[in-house]
Curated annotation (Swiss-Prot):
Organism of origin: Serratia proteamaculans (strain 568)
Cofactor(s) required for function per UniProt: [4Fe-4S] cluster
Record localization: Cell inner membrane
Cofactor note text: Binds 2 [4Fe-4S] clusters per subunit.
Keyword Iron: yes
GO molecular function, one term: 4 iron, 4 sulfur cluster binding
Protein name: Ion-translocating oxidoreductase complex subunit C
Domain of life: Bacteria
One GO location term (cellular component): plasma membrane
Membrane topology field: Peripheral membrane protein
Length: 703
């Protein structure tokens, strides 16, 4: 480090590889003093004039604005733009701007009122009283971007260099042919350039401050030396004229002998570089309180009768400046914004001047011939020798034409500074820089699409993760809410299950109890038909004595007595069965529900048995002459039948008692009663049929 400082004291400089020596063509405009261009009929102010996103509009159509009033606001790399004069906003619309693509961008159109009235300004008498953050904020609000051509936001650049800056370099090389804007600015305003440099030194606190200027600017060198008298800490370095010595990496190598690493900026090695025009704009913003609304623009070329350098307001149409400089268009006339090597041909003359516009070149046909026809590459290697970045332009050309993006990237395409030295020496007239610019744009578009895809994928994965977390959280809440059931809860569950079972059993009970009457009626009808058939056979086999009306009337009481006896027997049978299946006296509702059906069954059975008894009585009774005998036998048969009925009723009662549940659980008995009652009724019917058959047999034997 000590040897490096010793070299600085000895005014030592280094050299960079490559480079060319094109015709300078600077004398056309360097000897003419600065002039101020008149106000145009309208100003076209693009919202984006820097490297970064455009700001947010803070005005609308119809608003009246003053000179220096902000038109947009922004933070970070978003640099605001200001009104170049007082007037009225007539439109906010897309307009073609100073860009090689010729695409339209959003612009603010201002109709000047001719008064040129300033807005309220806030000058600072002593910038040393301000903190670093206050100085950076003022620089940002003034809308200052790099005036050397890159357009990087100055405030962001200074903010990033607050720590670790050892060397501050002021770039005054202005190496490209024709351009003399910085030269003329240093000749006439060297003291303000140095004052802006002192503000940067106060802000960054570098160890060394260097000004690099080419030796083809003797007047500017003299003016700077005069302004540096009594200004310690700033050293002036005069370097040989060589293109592109004004490049950031190249000038860094020339002044301090260090090379910037691949893919990095000068700040990576502790160097921060600013253009002399940017230093002048910083002085005006801090000391005078004026935003960046004008800059020095070189108007040169043989098609202009009054070439020189002008103070041009931002937003002034190029056509207005050319008219002021005596533009005399020729056949196949071209107008270039920038220098002949790094500039581009304007698609139209009504494009506006922006913050990075340093030159308008209007050459004659003899001065700059149109682009010759492109030939095939002969692999001469001259482009490799001329490249100041140490690249392989020939290989990059093939990769660009073949759209081999990854190979172009791997061969450090983005280290190309687009100086145009390779195209200048190419004998095949290949516009190499155009291929490189197109390839860079395509790679950036691919990277942007890949970034969007990755962002979308990240959002999708984040959504899935969020849904999974919510699912786990729900499950955890459910686990915490699920507590162990207590005994009381178990009782409640069992009660609910019992209610469900009782509801399910009700339809089955109704079906069983409902089917019994239907089946009984069918059986009764069948038995009735059989009885009628037997009666007809009996009438055919047994002679019937004539019976008078009085005799028929005498027989009716006997038949009624037999029917009554049978009914009493059936009633006695039904009574024990009903007692066996009915619920205790505490639930009379159940008995009430079952009584009608059982009564219907009993009535049907009684009718059938009465018919049978009538037939049997008719078959065994004697002729009408002996009615007393019949009358004497009927009570005996009734007594026998009654005795048999009582025996069967006792058996049925015992069976029903054996299967019924204890009286202590009436709820269970109630649930089982319908089925057991149906079974008991079927058994009773079978027993009654057998008893009737036995009784009939016994009566026959006795006769």
């Amino acid at each position: 480090m000590l040897n490096l400082f010793a070299a600085f004291k000895k005014d030592r400089i280094w050299d960079f590889d490559g480079g060319i020596h094109p015709p300078e063509m600077k004398t056309q405009s360097s000897g003419v003093p600065l002039r101020t261009a008149p106000l145009p009929d309208k100003f076209i102010i693009p919202l984006q004039q820097h490297l970064g996103p455009e700001g947010e509009l803070c005005v609308k159509v119809g608003d009246t604005v003053l000179k220096g009033q902000p038109l947009t606001v922004g933070r970070g790399r978003t640099v605001p733009v200001h009104a170049p004069t007082s007037g009225t906003i007539s439109a906010i619309t897309p307009h073609i701007t100073a860009h090689p693509s010729g695409l339209a961008e959003l612009c603010v159109i201002i109709q000047p009122d001719g008064e040129d009235r300033w807005c309220e300004r806030a000058p600072v008498a002593d910038y040393r009283q301000l903190t670093a953050s206050e100085l950076i904020q003022r620089i940002h609000q003034a809308g200052i971007a790099g005036l050397g051509g890159a357009g990087f936001p100055t405030a962001s650049k200074l903010q990033g260099g607050m720590n670790g800056v050892e060397t501050l370099i002021l770039n005054a090389a202005e190496c490209e042919p024709y351009i003399t804007a910085d030269d003329r600015l240093m000749q006439e305003h060297a003291d303000q350039v140095i004052e802006g440099t002192q503000i940067l030194r106060h802000l960054l606190q570098p160890k060394v401050t260097l000004i690099g200027i080419e030796d083809n600017k003797p007047e500017a060198i003299a003016a700077l030396k005069l302004a540096l008298r009594g200004q310690p800490g700033i050293a002036l370095r005069v370097i040989p004229t060589k293109y592109p010595s004004g490049g950031a990496k190249q000038l860094t190598k020339i002044l301090i002998g260090k090379e910037v690493p691949h893919g990095k900026h000068s700040s990576a090695i502790g160097v921060l570089m600013q253009n002399v025009g940017t230093a002048f704009a910083i002085k005006r913003a801090i000391v005078d309180g004026e935003p960046l609304i004008e800059r020095v623009v070189t108007l040169t070329g043989e098609a202009l009768s009054l070439p020189g350098n002008l103070w041009a307001r931002i937003g002034t149409p190029v056509q207005h400046l050319l008219k002021f400089a005596g533009f005399q268009p020729q056949a196949q006339q071209m107008v270039v914004m920038g220098g002949p090597l790094m500039g581009f041909t304007l698609p139209a003359l009504h494009v506006p001047i922006v913050k990075i516009s340093n030159c308008i070149l209007a050459p004659s046909v003899s001065e700059m011939a149109p682009q010759e026809q492109e030939q095939s590459c002969i692999r001469c290697g001259l482009c490799v020798d001329a490249c100041p970045a140490g690249l392989l332009p020939q290989q990059l050309y093939w990769f660009s034409r073949g759209e081999e993006h990854e190979k172009a990237r791997n061969h450090n395409l983005f280290d190309c500074i687009e100086c145009g030295a390779c195209a200048f020496v190419c004998p095949s007239n290949i516009p190499l820089v155009q291929y490189y610019r197109q390839e860079k744009a395509e790679i950036k578009a691919i990277d942007l699409e890949a970034a969007r895809t990755a962002e979308a994928k990240a959002r999708y994965e984040a959504k899935l993760a969020r849904l999974e977390r919510e699912k786990l959280a729900r499950e955890e809440r459910h686990k915490k809410a699920a507590v162990k059931l207590t005994d009381g809860d178990q009782d409640a569950v069992q009660a609910a299950l019992a209610r469900v079972r009782s509801k399910n059993a009700v339809p089955a009970t109704g079906t069983i109890s409902g089917d019994a009457p239907d089946n009984s009626e069918m059986n009764a009808a069948r038995e009735a038909r059989k009885a009628q058939a037997r009666e007809r056979r009996a009438q055919q086999e047994t002679p019937v004595a004539p019976v008078t009306a009085s005799a028929s009337e005498d027989e009716d009481p006997r038949k009624a007595a037999v029917a009554a006896a049978l009914a009493r027997v059936k009633a006695k049978k039904a009574a024990p069965q009903a007692t066996a299946v009915e619920t205790p006296a505490e639930s009379p509702a159940v008995v009430t529900e079952e009584d009608p059906r059982k009564a219907a069954v009993a009535a049907a059975l009684a009718r059938v048995k009465a018919k049978k008894a009538a037939q049997q009585a008719t078959a065994v009774e004697t002729p009408a002459e002996s009615p007393a005998v019949v009358t004497e036998e009927d009570p005996r048969k009734a007594a026998v039948a009654a005795a048999l009925a009582r025996v069967k009723a006792k058996k049925a009662a015992q069976q029903a008692t054996a299967v019924e549940t204890p009286a202590e659980s009436p709820a269970v008995v109630t649930e089982e009663d319908p089925r057991k009652a149906a079974v008991a009724a079927a058994i009773a019917r079978a027993k009654a049929k057998r008893a009737a058959q036995s009784l009939t047999t016994a009566d026959t034997d006795k006769e």
